[in-house]
UniProtKB/Swiss-Prot annotation:
Residues 35-188 form the Helicase ATP-binding domain. The lineage of its organism: Bacteria, Bacillati, Actinomycetota, Actinomycetes, Micrococcales. Its main location: cytoplasm. SMART domains: DEXDc, HELICc. This is UvrABC system protein B. It comes from Pseudarthrobacter chlorophenolicus (strain ATCC 700700 / DSM 12829 / CIP 107037 / JCM 12360 / KCTC 9906 / NCIMB 13794 / A6) (Arthrobacter chlorophenolicus).
Length: 704
């Protein structure tokens, strides 16, 4: 059996495919960035004004330097947005998405003041877990890879060496015993399930083995003739349709945290030694309660690891399992990249401080757990990278921001500037107004904008102020909503879409109206209390907020203030500097600024239409006993029927089974949308459409 041997990496060129060509400042920025990277500059800053196409510039830069790239972003929503943009620009290359797979995560903690221990509680998103596996799989099997990741990529991940050692290579014509392969799959943490075939499982029928790797949506079929692999194929797990024949494939483990029996037994011995050492320390300090607590918890974990190979909170023993020395850095996604990878930090003024803060935030919680006997000291080695450890693991770095921070500007030799927008749009005019009568003035400005079918953003300092202002504007007949951290994530996406569509005209917010919001319909951004110095009214925050009006031809920013603070002056001066450059460029080249037209395509709207069509179709389907529609489709047996559809393909599926499948996929579709996995939801929607077409054909033929 061929295991952790040489992996034949696919080497394909990065190629941007787009109807657009670099325009405005982009050609000069791409050339300058490429020259700096090729000359070996370690830190490069791209100061790119909002809306100048920094993402596209990055894609063209990757095409020029032809190196695997990690793009670090400040949050999941922007990561998804950026990954989609790169997938459109680099359709023939692997663009991966790597974020935390927790939908919900409550870390374990101990509050000494109230003697309260909080158990770890979490919920894992399976689709995000698949995408994480897809990212590591791509990094190990090809070079043309762009991974868009949040800061969670500096948290511990299993070692690449163990991950590769656990891999199995399937090669057509190779000698391999079927039973040995099945045992190997089990050791890789895949589960055999002949009835419910899904990601992370395999099934066996005679000499045919099928598996859906953790990182794939397609299944792999391996056909044996004796002890020889006769055929390898990829197929659609739902329909059974063969996608293509394969000569060679790699199957990686179902978990990044794979440890063989030898490694696990070594780890258990090390944990036992540390426990004995720590108990001695606690007892010498007369901390008998803490010693007893630690003995009970650790002994239980050790028994679970010996019997099951796993225990809750096993990540706290990761340094022992990895065989790392005390205090050494954990392995993480960065270790899966080749040595020459390029790092791009998006919105660096926010993301760089995030990276630096991760370690201390994690340590403050863990110290309490160790001091009070809930964890061994080695639990503190299950952590994100420290800032200096992060720097050791990265090579050349490009920082992207409209407002670069002092750190990146201090590291770089000057900066590359991208001020001109391809559309010719210029930065908005900034007007400072007195706070006296600011709400009445705001109301008048809103009415002027709504008459022109334009939208308004209003930014306040507190949630209370946002809600009170929303109530006041509603009372004066304004169509308005508010947006702050208490509004759930999916609702935020819906609010932004509804604002663009004109469902309402004004959106009131606090700190969410900054990086990454792309709203071409917004012609006015009003900043209340602009002279209140602080994080929300720093020069960086003000420039970012001003940028929200930079996508509209008639964009304006109104700052309500009784004095001009240093932050306001810096923001206004920088905006005026950029305006002057943009106006001069447009005049010289005879460019008339064009409105930015961006399609309002939102999956939530498409799902609503799909639901209406599904209800209309299934409403005509009789289940007996008066049950019609999608509720009937959820009756007992629907899932079993759905599994049968998967196994036998559509042609063999009776109408009732198809209906069950439609209902099940509809539920999955909404689940994916709720997790902001819009691409997944769209793919499931397409499957639902195909199944409904099949059902309609059966009805037309009189078979349903």
């Amino acid at each position: 059996m061929s295991l952790a041997q040489d992996i034949n990496r696919v080497v394909a060129p990065f190629e941007v495919i787009s109807e657009f060509k670099p325009a405005g400042d982009q050609p000069a920025a791409i050339a300058d960035l490429t020259e700096r990277i090729n000359n070996g500059e370690k830190d490069v800053v791209l100061l790119g004004a909002t809306g100048t196409g920094k993402s596209a510039t990055t894609a063209w830069l990757i095409e020029q330097v032809q190196r695997p790239t990690l793009v670090m972003v400040q949050n999941k929503t922007l990561a998804a947005q950026l990954a989609n943009e790169f997938r459109e620009l680099l359709p023939n290359n692997a663009v991966e998405y790597f974020v935390s797979y927790y939908d919900y995560y409550q870390p374990e903690a101990y509050v000494a003041q109230t003697d309260t221990f909080i158990e770890k509680d979490s919920s894992i998103n399976e689709e995000v877990e698949r995408l994480r596996h897809s990212a590591t799989n791509a990094l190990l099997t090809r070079r043309d890879v762009v991974v868009v990741a949040t800061v969670s990529c500096i948290y511990g991940l299993g070692t690449p060496e163990e991950y590769i050692a656990g891999m199995v290579t399937l090669r057509k014509g190779a000698e391999m015993n079927r039973d040995d392969l099945l045992r190997k799959f089990v050791s890789m943490q895949y589960a055999r399930n002949d009835m419910d075939f899904h990601r992370g499982t395999f099934r066996v029928r005679g000499d045919t083995v099928e598996i859906i790797p953790m990182y794939e949506e397609l299944a792999i079929r391996i056909e044996f003739f004796g002890d020889e692999i006769e055929n390898i194929q990829t197929l659609h797990p739902l329909t059974g349709q063969i996608i293509q024949d394969e000569e060679e494939m790699y199957v990686f483990p179902a978990s990044h945290y794979v440890a063989g029996p030898e490694r696990m037994s070594r780890a258990i011995k090390r944990i036992e030694d540390e426990l004995a050492e720590r108990l001695q320390v606690l007892e010498s300090q007369n901390k008998l309660v803490e010693a007893q607590r630690l003995r009970m918890r650790t002994t239980y974990d050790l028994e679970m690891m010996q019997q099951m190979g796993f225990c809750n909170g096993i990540e706290n023993y990761s340094s022992h399992i990895d065989g790392r020395a005390r205090g050494t850095a954990p392995h993480c996604l960065l270790d899966y990249f080749p040595d020459d990878f390029l790092l791009v930090i998006d919105e660096s003024h926010v993301t760089v401080p995030q990276i630096g803060a991760m370690y201390e935030g994690d340590m403050s919680r863990k110290r309490n757990l160790v001091d009070f006997g809930f964890r061994l000291p080695s639990a503190m080695d299950n952590r994100p990278l420290k800032w200096d450890e992060f720097l050791e693991r990265v090579g050349q770095t490009v920082y992207l921001s409209a407002t670069p921070g002092k750190y990146e500007l201090g590291k770089a030799d000057g900066f590359v500037q991208q001020i001109i927008r391809p559309t010719g749009l210029i930065d908005p005019e900034v007007v400072v107004k007195p706070t006296k009568g600011q709400i009445d003035d705001l109301l008048g400005e809103i009415r002027t904008r709504t008459e022109r079918n334009e939208r308004v953003l209003v930014t306040t300092l507190t949630k209370r102020m946002a809600e009170d202002l929303t109530d006041y504007l509603l009372g004066h007949g304004v169509k308005v909503e508010y947006l702050h951290s208490d509004v759930d994530t999916l609702r935020r996406v819906e609010l932004l879409r509804e604002l663009r569509m004109g469902t309402f005209d004004v959106l009131v917010g606090i700190n969410l109206l900054r990086e990454g919001l792309d709203l071409p319909e917004v012609s006015l951004v009003s900043i209340l209390d602009a002279d209140k110095e602080g994080f929300l009214r720093s020069s960086t925050s003000l420039i970012q907020t001003i940028g929200r009006a930079a996508r509209n031809v008639s964009g304006q920013v109104h700052m309500y203030a009784d004095r001009i603070t240093d932050s306001m002056a810096q923001a206004i001066d920088e905006t005026n500097r950029r305006r002057a450059i943009q106006v001069a460029y447009n005049t010289e080249h005879g460019i008339d600024p064009q409105p930015l037209r961006k399609k309002i395509a939102d999956i939530t709207d498409q799902l609503a239409k799909e639901d209406a069509d599904t209800d209309a179709l299934l409403g005509s389907f009789d289940y007996g006993k008066g049950k019609r529609g999608i509720t009937g489709a959820n009756k007992p047996g629907a899932k079993k029927a759905a599994a049968q559809v998967r196994a036998d393909g559509l042609a063999a599926a009776p109408a009732e089974d198809l209906v069950g499948m439609i209902a099940q996929l509809t539920e999955q579709m909404h689940g994916a949308a709720a997790e902001l996995q819009f691409e997944v939801a769209a793919r499931i929607r397409d499957e639902v459409s195909e199944l409904k077409k099949e059902l309609r054909q059966m009805q037309a033929a009189g078979h349903a």
